[in-house]
């Protein structure tokens, strides 16, 4: 049996890893995940920056429930492969639900620049067109945009949580919510 290689891209921003892996979740699993989050009740409680009046829609996931899900197993397998000499504990899990017109800000998931923590973002969709926009932009420590990662069904982005980044809102022509499953992983010391 021939195993197909998935597309993978490795970058470094100020010495911190940013890894993009395609097709981590596909087929029926992606369809089920997308259907679930499309219908799940969201809460407008999240903010990209401290003190912001804007709130973003998220679908919280209890940690003990997230740990038992096939998507978490697939993501953690990739984390283990790409960070082989490190171990992580799932600290938080939720799905971002971003729509046209949402205001998003550049932020770091961990403010400490030396943090070894990792954020995993899985784009949850059965289809995403290029003209729908929604790219995630990654910045260096000087605030310069260094990489843009396009949303793509089943695409996983692993990055050190200290990398500043900003999610992109979908364009006006997009009739869907941009869903990204986020796992915040604490590095075990």
Residue ranges with predicted function:
Residues 77-189:
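Catalytic core of non-heme Fe(II) oxygenases with the double-stranded beta-helix
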